[in-house]
Every structure is written in C-alpha cells, then in structure tokens.
Amino acid sequence: MINMKPQYYLGMMSGTSLDGVDIVLVDFSQDPQLILSDFFPMPEDLREKLTTLIQVGETTLQNLGELDHKLALLYSDCVNAFLQKNTFLPNQIQAIGCHGQTVWHSPNSQFPFTMQLGDMNLLAAKTGISVIGDFRRKDMAWGGQGAPLVPAFHEAVFSNSNFATAVLNIGGISNVSILFPNQAVIGFDTGPGNTLLDQWIEKHQGLRYDENGEWAAKGNVNKVLLDELLNEPFFSLPAPKSTGRELFNLVWLNHKIAKIREKLTALSVEMSFRPEDVQATLVELTVTSIVNALNQLQTDLPKRLLVCGGGAKNSLIMRGLHDNLLDWQVSTTTEQGFDIDYVEAAAFAWLAYCRINNLPANLPSVTGAKSAVSLGAIFPKD
C-alpha cells in the first residue's frame, strides 16, 4: 500500500445563525477525510452588530469596513487556536477555505450581487497560510445564483449508485442536494431552517436557540399562521433558487402575524399568538417546506435522506421528517463519516482544494451558471 503524503486543508464557515465559527481539517490525499473539527463562539458584540446590519440592510462605510476587519481577526484567532490545540504548524496546511460572513445575498436584482465580510488578506497575514475566499461571486459572474455551492461537495462524498440520495443541510436556511444516479445534480434552498426559530426564541426567551425543540414542543401549531407563512412566493419558485435572512427574519414574521390579525379584526374574530405556539408553527414551516420540496422528486430507486446542520439535533424537526417522508430512509451524515455540525465547513475545505488544483467546483444545474468554473480568489500568505 502506498503511503501518500497528507494534503491538509482547513475549512471555515460562519453561517446565517451567527452563533460562531466552524473549523475543520480535511485530508485530500485520497478520498476526502474529516480529521479534526471544532467550534468557536462569536463574540456577542460582533454578533449583535452583524445581526443589525443584516436585518436593517443599511450601514455606514466605516461600520462595514470595521466589521470586515473584526471578522478577519476572529477567523485568524480561530485558526491559530485550532492549530495550536491540535499541534499543527501553518506550513503543514495547504490552504484555508474561508466562506466569510454573508451579510447580503441578492442574486435576482437588476444588478445581482452577494456580499461576504472578512478580510481574507488579513486572515492570510495573521495565520501564515494562504487563503481561498470570495467563492460565490465567480459563479454569479457566470450567470449563477452564487448559491448553493455545497451540493458539488455533497456529490463528491455522498453520491451512491444504489440510492437516490438527498442531502439536507438544516442551518439558518435549509438547503437540499439531490444526488440521483444518471441525473444532473439539483440543489436549492427550501426555505428557513433554524433562523426564524433562533430569532424568535431569542426575542421571547433570551436564548440563542431552542435546544432539542423543547420550547416548541410546549406549543401548538397555528394552522392559519402556517398557511400564511407558506404563501410566501419564494416557496413556489422553481429551482435553482436561494434565499437568506434578508427575507426570512422577524420583520417578515411580524408582518405575517399582523396581516392575519388585521383580517381577523375585520371579522371580529380573536386569535391568540402565544410565543410557544408561534415557535411550534415555525418548526412546522421548516418541516413542511422541506417535505413539499422532496415530495416533488420522482425516482424508482430506494430513496435516502442524509440530514446535517444544527436542525439535525432538533428532535421535533427530525420527527416531522420521519413522519412525513415515509418512503425515505432518513438518517444523518454522521453515519457517512461527516459530523452533522461540520459538513458545510468541510465543503469549503474542498472548494479550496478545487481552487488550488484548478478544478471546476460549481454545478450549473444547481446554481444556473452558464458554465462550470473554478471558484474563489487566492490570497497568498506572503
């Protein structure tokens, strides 16, 4: 057996939940292998400023520049702590694949753009490791949505000729990769994952997230509210499609609740919107939007669903998927060698590997781009 020299890449992801930074070490000397992983919480002041920026959608250039710098410092601290903890040296790492922090994603406007903060030059300088970043804009330059990018990685590590596989990532936003044998890969956002659940419980309970769906379990689904939420035009758009917190946020949710109240007031009807009932309804929104998307798929092969992301730890969401997808074998990516919490971070290590090796890494069938191209810009360490 040939002993191949390890090809170590770091992958970093801070997602729409804004809870912190996921970091992984992946070896690409043979089949991609997840070696190490860790999570670093985001400082509260930085989290609050980013949340405000994303929800309001307006800021000063000064604030934008400072957040760009602060995120790079956070990322570099995470990398250096991760390497020190695991006794790795910077020169053992080929490159860092860093997604950055999305603050706006507008692929369907007259002038499409996406914006991720985190100065990659500073990250390279502070770590002594070359960085690959700015992945999404290359795809958009070629007419794509710039998202989702992870399905290409899912295809590389999870495709199986014996199964019609769907890989479901329930992060802040839920996205799914459809890996059916002999078919072009399809990947798209299904709608909110944890983002509304996290924002709602933080507002009403002061908690970052609803652990295991325990608060939602105390509530009852409000069918009227659920129907109103599902009326959002995004859900009926054809794939490829992508979305984010710029749509699914508390402003959107409160507008929907106010709309129902207005209708009911005109009919002299009262309806309670207990916070825990709204939380239960938001769980049902996540589940229903996923189920509706998967039920449209046709295949004669056995179907399996591999779930990853924070939502895979919410027993209410997982029970909803099991109960409503009876012809699917539902499990998690952990059983396939990739921890549910670190699949996205591993994907950006893979994207960095592809960029260094000049391999195309987007899927036109997923993003709508005119061509398969290499993604990301290289920020050398020196």
Swiss-Prot record:
UniProt EC number: 2.7.1.170
One GO BP annotation of this record: peptidoglycan turnover
Domain of life the protein comes from: Bacteria
Signal peptide residue numbers: none
Gene Ontology molecular-function annotations: ATP binding; kinase activity; phosphotransferase activity, alcohol group as acceptor
Residues at which ATP binds: 15-22
InterPro entries: Anhydro_N_Ac-Mur_kinase, ATPase_NBD
Reaction catalysed by this enzyme: 1,6-anhydro-N-acetyl-beta-muramate + ATP + H2O = N-acetyl-D-muramate 6-phosphate + ADP + H(+)
Broad class of enzyme this protein falls into: transferase
Alphabetical UniProt keywords: ATP-binding, Carbohydrate metabolism, Kinase, Nucleotide-binding, Transferase
Pathway the protein takes part in: Amino-sugar metabolism; 1,6-anhydro-N-acetylmuramate degradation; Cell wall biogenesis; peptidoglycan recycling
Cited Pfam families: AnmK
Family per similarity comment: Belongs to the anhydro-N-acetylmuramic acid kinase family.
Free-text function comment from the UniProt entry: Catalyzes the specific phosphorylation of 1,6-anhydro-N-acetylmuramic acid (anhMurNAc) with the simultaneous cleavage of the 1,6-anhydro ring, generating MurNAc-6-P. Is required for the utilization of anhMurNAc either imported from the medium or derived from its own cell wall murein, and thus plays a role in cell wall recycling.
Protein name per its UniProtKB record: Anhydro-N-acetylmuramic acid kinase
Lineage: Bacteria, Pseudomonadati, Pseudomonadota, Gammaproteobacteria, Pasteurellales
